Regions:
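Q-loop/switch helix immediately C-terminal to the Walker
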Residues: 2-19, 28
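Conserved ABC ATPase "signature" region
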Residues: 11, 26-45
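Helix N-cap at the start of a conserved alpha-helix in ABC-type nucleotide-binding domains
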Residues: 86-87
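Hydrophobic anchor residue at the start of the ABC signature
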Residues: 64-65, 92
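Catalytic Walker B motif of ABC-type/P-loop ATPase nucleotide-binding domains
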Residues: 75-79
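A short, proline-enriched helix->beta-strand linker immediately N-terminal to the Walker B motif
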Residues: 68-74
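ABC ATPase signature
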Residues: 4, 46, 54, 67-68
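Conserved switch/coupling elements of ABC/ABC-like ATPase nucleotide-binding domains
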Residues: 125, 129-134
Length: 155
């Protein structure tokens, strides 16, 4: 993976997973590169410890892009901000928020989020040993409709 570019990995994934014409696949790849803000580095190798390549945030956005190529309505992400500095983590969450605002359902696990990252989420579900112990619809999302914050505890 270190020697392939985001454009190449998106094209490869599109060829494997999409039943579209070559032109439609190419257009999907170009749109995805633009949507993910990867225009500047679309032809840069991903890289690794030994090969200089994408930054951590660019690499994270490219990995999300591999899943987005099929235009799923639901996206599951496990720790999408792990290993990123706070600014890059916020940038990744802003991308996910934009996707959610455009109708995509995003489910993500985040362990020990900063208050800045925590504030980006619309809904929170806290689980312990597989049981829901706390659920909240954030005040920010519905405050204009409800005029109050809401939360529900489960026992």
């Amino acid at each position: 993976m270190a020697t392939i570019t985001p454009r190449e990995v998106f094209t490869f994934t599109a060829n494997l997973r999409l039943k579209l014409s070559k032109a439609e696949k190419k257009q999907r790849v170009e749109n995805l590169i633009k949507d993910l803000g990867l225009e500047r580095c679309a032809d840069t190798k991903v890289g690794n410890t030994f090969i200089r390549g994408l930054s951590g945030g660019e690499r994270k956005r490219a990995s999300i892009g591999v899943e987005l190529i099929t235009n799923p309505s639901l996206l599951f992400l496990d720790e999408p901000t792990t290993g990123l500095d706070s600014t890059t983590a916020l940038n990744v969450l802003e991308l996910l928020k934009k996707l959610a605002q455009n109708g995509r359902n995003i489910v993500s696990t985040i362990h020990q989020p900063s208050s800045e990252i925590f504030s980006q989420f619309d809904n929170l579900l806290l689980m312990v040993r597989g049981n829901v112990i706390y659920q909240v619809i954030t005040y920010k999302k519905y405050s204009s409709k409800l005029k109050i914050g809401t939360c529900r505890f489960s026992s």
